[in-house]
Structures are given as structure tokens and as C-alpha cells.
Amino acid sequence: MATTPDPSRRRLLGSLAFGACNAILPVGWSADEPGLESSARSTRRVGIAAAGWAGVPCVSVELRDEEQQRVLRTGGNGPTYAIVPVPFSAGTLEVDVAAELTGRGAPEARGFVGVSFHVDEAAETYEAVYLRMTNGRLNRPMPPAPRIDRAVQYVAHPGFHYAVSRERYPGRYEKGADIGLGLWHRLRLEVERSRLRAMVDGREVLAVDDLRYAGREGPIGLWIDDGTRGYFRRLRIS
């Protein structure tokens, strides 16, 4: 169960709206262009823009051209996220996510989209839970084994990405899920000390009891990876 935020932190939270997209963010931020895109920041690796997907307003996050080319040369799994500068250590993160393939990634691109947290000051180390949308059980045709059991993933950067956890602890940090490419899904992360519970559309899909950066406070990230355009809306942090 997620921890209850400190009352003083609650007083720092307000609400901004982007069409049908709501984000709970610190009071005092610019409301000239209210919404998720006015609080999330692009980085040298990813760009963020106002968008619409499946009939609803949202923001899109995608690798910049030079980063996409680097990923094709050397592989992904880097700090590829737009920064939402809200201090977070423990509590609950919720956001609607969707993804599409850009056609610019490797053949193994799976529609990678999720949330990073416990991000350090340099925005280089982090933990994340992400979805591989093409590996979900709602795709038609359904993906073959073992992909169908690899739709949700926990990682810590650097040093603990899927290849490491898959080799050392097969099936422990990745699970199957009822998700699909091009569909909206509600991703919820509950973080308490070294424990994490991940839910998709109200159903628990992954539990981790040994977070690598437990207790670290830092911003969160709207995370994507190779060959993916990720869509985000209704971000909520509590």
C-alpha cells in the first residue's frame, strides 16, 4: 500500500488542466499554457509536444533524431524521458499512456512507454516501469511466447535493465499484461520504501520489493525508448 504524502507536501500541490488532461503539480508554475506540456521539459534526448491520440488531447514524447540514431548504433535503455520537475520519493504516480511505432527504430521496437522515478539531479540515473505495448495480450494477432509474458518491465539505470534481470531472475521483473498498441491504458505505480506495486487499468501486474534507489527524492519522467512515440495524459502525483 502506498504511503500517505506529508501534509506540507500536499499544500504544495495544485491542479492544471490541458483539455481533458489533468495534472497535479506545484502551485506557482506558469499557467500561460496550462497542462502537462507546460510542466514537462524536453531534454537533449527527447522532445515533447502537444498532441491528440484516439480522440483525446495529450502530449507526445519521442526520441530526437540524433538520439534515435545513437540508439540504433549502440542500443537503448538510456535516460530517455521528458522531465516533470515534481519532487517524488514515495507515494503514487498515475498516468494514462499509449504508444505507436514510428518506423524509425530497430525491428525489436515494441512500443516502449512508461514512467521513470527516483531520478538523480543530473537526470542520468533512475528507476522505471514501462510497458511493451506490442507484447500485450490485447494485440491481434497475439504475440508469441515468450514475448506475451514480457509486457511490463521494471528497470534501474544504469546496470539493471531487462537483459540483466532476465538472465539473473527470469520472470521476476517482467510480466504479461492486458495491453495493446494504440490503446490508452492507466498506469499506476505505488512506491513505499523499497517496494513498488504496478497496476494497469486497475489490475496489479508487477510487484518489486528491492528498489535500487529507494528513498531518493527527485523528479519523475515520461519515459519512452527506441522507435516509439509515447502519449501521456491525466498525470497525477500524490
Task: Give the label of every model feature segment.
Residues 31-238:
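Extracellular glycan-recognition regions
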Residues 12-13:
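Hydrophobic alpha-helical targeting segments used for export or membrane insertion
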Residues 1-8, 18-22:
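N-terminal secretory signal peptides
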